[in-house]
C-alpha cells in the first residue's frame, strides 16, 4: 500500500477531468480526493496497493478525460492516510 500527492497541469480544467479521475479511482478502488486549484492545475491525493496505484497514476498521466491533456504530472510519496472513498473536493 502506498499514497501519493499529484499535481497535473495542461488542459485539466473545464474538461471533466475531476469527474473522470473519480470514475477511474472508483473503478480501481483507489481512495483519496481530486480538486481544481486557482492556478489552473488539478491536485490529487491517492492511496491504493502499489500495482493499483501505479495503474491509476498511468491513467491520470494519459488524462482520464477524452477532452483533457496532461502536459506535466508531478508525483510525490506521502504518508498513508485514512479514507475509504475517492471524492471530488470543491
UniProtKB/Swiss-Prot annotation:
The keyword Hydrolase appears for this protein: yes
Enzyme class: hydrolase
Enzymatic reactions: an acyl phosphate + H2O = a carboxylate + phosphate + H(+)
Active-site residues per Swiss-Prot or TrEMBL entry: 18, 36
A GO term for molecular function: acylphosphatase activity
Family annotation (Gene3D superfamilies): 3.30.70.100
InterPro entries linked: Acylphosphatase, Acylphosphatase-like_dom, Acylphosphatase-like_dom_sf
Protein name in the entry: Acylphosphatase
Gene: acyP
Amino acid at each position: 500500500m502506498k499514497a501519493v500527492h499529484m499535481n497535473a497541469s495542461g488542459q485539466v480544467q473545464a474538461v471533466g477531468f475531476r469527474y473522470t479521475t473519480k470514475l477511474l479511482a472508483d473503478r480501481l478502488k483507489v481512495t483519496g480526493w481530486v480538486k481544481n486549484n486557482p492556478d489552473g492545475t488539478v491536485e490529487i491525493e491517492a492511496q491504493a496497493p502499489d500495482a493499483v496505484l501505479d495503474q491509476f497514476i498511468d491513467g491520470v498521466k494519459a488524462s482520464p478525460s477524452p477532452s483533457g491533456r496532461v502536459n506535466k504530472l508531478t508525483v510525490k510519496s506521502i504518508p498513508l492516510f485514512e479514507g475509504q472513498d475517492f471524492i471530488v473536493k470543491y
